[in-house]
Curated annotation (Swiss-Prot):
Gene3D superfamilies: Bira Bifunctional Protein, Domain 2, GAD-like domain, Nucleic acid-binding proteins. The gene is aspS. GO terms for cellular component: cytoplasm. It holds the Pfam family tRNA-synt_2. This is Aspartate--tRNA(Asp/Asn) ligase. One of its GO terms (biological process) is aspartyl-tRNA aminoacylation. Belongs to the class-II aminoacyl-tRNA synthetase family. Type 1 subfamily. It is found in: Cytoplasm. Residues 201-204 are annotated as: Aspartate. The keyword Nucleotide-binding applies. It comes from Prochlorococcus marinus (strain AS9601). Its EC number is 6.1.1.23. NCBIfam families: aspS_bact, PRK00476.1.
């Protein structure tokens, strides 16, 4: 049907007869001549139809509506100099039409304009419902092509290092990995369910036990959790696992992979090793294990200075084992008003939404500190000197303080830090600040349920375990850091991994630490324990979020812009109206009865 696509055309085609297929992007009538912007998947070309070319042809062209599918044949001409479009690769060319065929008319008015000229004015709900029209606009297609290139580069890199791509099951066993599972009823086993995998974690470990040595997979994963801009109920991981490997070797190898992707896709070179930071340093200085290091405003601990000045909120925070921390906003006295950091203000609300009771503040004015009387009246000259030294605050700076539970203080000041950085344009968006975060704790304490929870997952290997007897082993595990590492970019986690537990006894003890009984371990993970007893090699790996990598590379705000047919933030597919009801006969086959609470 066609012998060229738009992007292939250049000055060497002038005078040649070509056949093109595509959509009518726009039609314009000027001085008795019809101009049509023909669009295909590769780009645009202006085509012209003159009454002198034939009355029937001209009449047919007059009926064309935007998005009509056409095939045209004609001669490539050079455009007049005053009509050259320097924004198009074909902007110096046009096609003088000799023949036009309508391949498909549009039936109704479109729900939104497909032309790139109206791209920004369309609500996302409509774009998701009519995703095929959104794809046709080109921007989304370019995103998908960029995603394809990322995958291609990763595959070639891993293939060259002797990795084998293996598909692992999508119908598997429900195991406690953190988020809720998506369950699939098993018709042939009444009352039993498969689960869609949250990750290929256990299968890739079993591949190492099987001697595969180096594995990777572009893996579909599923988590039934609340959504946000960078999450979807189904998502894609670049999943990697290796045998007989150290943590240092995994970090170094995967850093090379990421550098290769950025080089091939964006033509950006990183000559130096990515910096590293321990989990504890990240939490102390940024309040998060995913720090954005493109700007300052580091968290500073003022507990030793303010904990005993007699201000009740500060005293209570320290006595209960909490924090008093601060961030310093350079020049904040002029850029942030009191209204914004008091109850009802936008910055106050950011802290409140993160769980904080509020924000205290200190304004530095010359050698004096301006704050509420209950704080100021209890500050000695020594206190003031210590505050200025720790916070590194100068005249004109604003110090914001949080006090209370450690997690809430860190979380709220982290959110406030991010919010202010965006509001004051402190972020250099041209920077790619990669960071390895290492030495995570094995567990975090769930005080509500009086038990430990794995910070990553319960298959991470603890560091420096020496004990063999159960009681001492239990104590060592509980206080150990993990052989775990995350790669963070500009405040977002790109991927995370660890060395895995390859000894059955240690794996059983870790699972007991997170609250499972021996019986529960055998029921849920018996197959893994058994495999580890049969000569499992030391192994480890990492999983990168492919959707998130693509989002950052293309500069999008949501991973929905990297996925052909994503769900919305209510986990619904607006295109197919899924999830949806199923028939009574289908439910009967599965022996499932649905009851809905009134």
């Amino acid at each position: 049907m066609r012998n060229k696509i738009c992007e292939e055309l250049n000055n060497t085609d002038i005078g040649k007869l070509v056949n093109l297929c595509g959509w009518v992007d726009r039609r314009r009538d000027h001085g008795g001549v019809i101009f049509i912007d023909l669009r295909d998947h590769s780009g645009f070309l202006q085509i012209t139809i003159n009454p002198d070319d034939g009355a029937d042809l001209f009449k047919q062209a007059e009926t064309l509506r935007n998005e009509t599918v056409i095939m045209v044949s004609g001669i490539i001409n050079e455009r007049p100099k005053d009509s050259i479009n320097t924004n198009l690769s074909t902007g110096e060319l046009e096609l003088k039409v000799k023949d036009l065929q309508i391949l498909n008319q549009i039936k109704n008015n479109l729900p939104f304009p497909v032309s790139i000229h109206d791209y920004e004015n369309t609500k996302e709900e409509l774009r998701l419902k009519y995703r095929y029209l959104d794809l046709r606009r080109g921007k989304l297609l370019e995103n998908l092509k960029k995603r394809h290139k990322i995958i291609k580069v990763a595959r070639e890199f891993l293939d060259n290092f002797g990795f084998t791509e293996v598909e692992t099951p999508l119908l598997t066993k429900s195991t406690p990995e953190g988020a809720r599972d998506f369950l699939v009823p098993a018709r042939l086993s009444n009352g039993e369910f498969f689960a869609l995998p949250q990750s290929p974690q256990l299968f890739k470990q079993l591949l190492m036990v099987g001697g595969l040595d180096k594995y990777y997979q572009i893996a579909k994963c599923f988590r039934d959790e609340d959504l946000r801009a960078d999450r979807q109920p189904e998502f894609t991981q670049l999943d990697i696992e290796m045998s007989f490997i150290s943590e240092e070797e995994i970090i170094s190898f995967n850093e090379s992979l990421i550098k290769k992707i950025w080089k091939e896709v964006l033509n950006i070179n990183f000559n130096n090793a990515f910096p590293r930071m321990t989990w504890q340093a990240a939490m102390d200085n940024y309040g998060t294990d995913r720090p954005d290091t493109r700007y300052q405003m580091l968290l500073k601990d003022l507990g030793g200075v303010l904990g005993n000045i007699g201000f009740n909120i500060f005293t209570k925070a320290i006595k209960s084992g909490g924090y008093i921390k601060s961030i310093t906003v350079k020049g904040g006295n002029s850029s942030i008003s009191n209204v914004r950091i008091k109850p009802g203000g936008d910055i106050f609300k950011v802290a409140q939404d993160a769980g904080a009771g509020g924000l205290a503040f200190i304004r530095v004015k010359g050698d004096e500190l301006e704050t509420i009387g209950a704080i100021k009246n209890n500050l000695s000259e020594e206190h003031i000197a210590d505050i200025l030294k720790i916070t590194e605050a100068k005249d004109g700076d604003l110090i914001l303080l949080g006090a209370g539970d450690k997690q809430i203080v860190n979380q709220s000041l982290d959110r406030v830090r991010q919010y202010i950085a965006k509001e004051l344009n402190l972020i250099d968006k041209s920077k790619w600040n990669f960071l390895w975060v290492t030495d995570f704790p094995m567990f975090e304490r769930n005080e509500d349920e009086n038990r430990y929870e794995a910070l990553h997952h319960p298959f991470c290997s603890p560091k420096n375990i020496k004990s063999k007897d159960s009681e001492n082993l239990k104590k060592e595990i509980e206080s150990s850091t993990a052989n775990a590492y995350d790669l963070v970019l500009n405040g977002l986690e790109l991927g995370g991994g660890s060395l895995r537990i390859h000894e059955a006894n240690l794996q059983r003890q870790v699972l007991k630490t997170v609250g499972l009984t021996d019986k529960e371990i055998d029921e849920k993970f018996g197959f893994l324990i058994e495999a580890l007893e049969m000569g499992a090699p030391p192994h480890g790996g990492i999983a990168f979020g492919l959707d998130r990598i693509t989002m950052l590379i293309i500069g999008a705000d949501s991973i929905r812009e990297t996925i052909a047919f994503p769900k919305n933030q209510q986990a619904k597919c607006l295109l197919t109206n899924a999830p949806s009801n199923v028939s009574e006969s289908q439910l009967k086959e599965l022996d499932i009865e649905i009851t809905i609470d009134e």
